[in-house]
Amino acid sequence: MEFIDNIRYKKIKNAVGRAVADFGLIRDGDRIAVAVSGGKDSYTLLHILEGLRRRAPVKYELVAVTIDSGYPGFRSDVIASYLREQGFAHHLETTDHYDIIREKRRPGSSYCSICARLKRGVLYTLAQKLGCNKLALGHHLDDFVETLLLNQFFVGTLKAMAPRMLADNGETTVIRPLVYVEEREIIPFARENRFPVVCCSCPVCGTADLQRRRMKKLLTELEKENPAVKRSLLRALGNVQPRYLLDLELQRLCDVP
């Protein structure tokens, strides 16, 4: 694919390249399943990883994977057609998640948490089925810092996301190469390159995850005083000083008498 905004493309690609190097996300011989939901983030991730692959000093393979959870109106055919036109290997997995969620969901709860857990399980299984040792997800910098704030404000933990971690199945390594890329860089990139964005078609999409939207709003307000606040929060995740925290295990590790 020939990108409209070459400068923006290079900026995002360089940021992903730094993340790959900093966190050891990709190694020679990797076969990577890239989760493509039909959103701007996953399309961007797939194209950037392909751009890096063509010039990388190591050899790796990409396989795009999409899960159709059975939500009425979800246009998985649009995703499949686009990826086929772009020359990507693509696997579409159809599930009955929508029916399961409607049956199991507690009254008043959102679809999001159940849906996410079900999708994760399928993605891990798919990665193994397709011979992939890694699964790439499209979480960007904003997702990392919003998750950090959500866990601090509502859960009481110092926890965000990891750019590289072993999945629950103990077999697949999950990577998040967009960790250094802000959402505001992805939005115009996706728009200018006319990615065929497909909404998830969830019946409560847009009303769920209100707490995350509150974090987005808070960060937007903070940026008015400190434009670098999101990157500062991200740096904090890699600049931990255990002796100044309250975790008792960390205190023992620091040999505090």
Swiss-Prot record:
Motif PP-loop motif: where in chain: 37-42
Domain of life: Bacteria
Gene Ontology molecular function: any one: ATP binding
Annotated catalysed reactions: cytidine(32) in tRNA + S-sulfanyl-L-cysteinyl-[cysteine desulfurase] + AH2 + ATP = 2-thiocytidine(32) in tRNA + L-cysteinyl-[cysteine desulfurase] + A + AMP + diphosphate + H(+)
Gene Ontology BP, a term: tRNA thio-modification
Record flagged with keyword DNA damage: no
Gene3D superfamilies: HUPs (3.40.50.620)
InterPro entries, per database record: Rossmann-like_a/b/a_fold, TilS/TtcA_N, tRNA_Cyd_32_2_STrfase, tRNA_thiolation_TtcA_Ctu1
Subcellular location: Cytoplasm
Cofactor names: Mg(2+); [4Fe-4S] cluster
GO CC annotation, single: cytosol
Pathway: tRNA modification
EC number: 2.8.1.-
Binding site for [4Fe-4S] cluster: 112, 115, 202
Cofactor info, note text: Binds 1 [4Fe-4S] cluster per subunit. The cluster is chelated by three Cys residues, the fourth Fe has a free coordination site that may bind a sulfur atom transferred from the persulfide of IscS.
Pfam families: ATP_bind_3
Function: Catalyzes the ATP-dependent 2-thiolation of cytidine in position 32 of tRNA, to form 2-thiocytidine (s(2)C32). The sulfur atoms are provided by the cysteine/cysteine desulfurase (IscS) system.
Miscellaneous remark of the record: The thiolation reaction likely consists of two steps: a first activation step by ATP to form an adenylated intermediate of the target base of tRNA, and a second nucleophilic substitution step of the sulfur (S) atom supplied by the hydrosulfide attached to the Fe-S cluster.
Subunit structure: Homodimer.
Protein name: tRNA-cytidine(32) 2-sulfurtransferase
Organism: Geobacter sulfurreducens (strain ATCC 51573 / DSM 12127 / PCA)
Gene name, Swiss-Prot/TrEMBL: ttcA
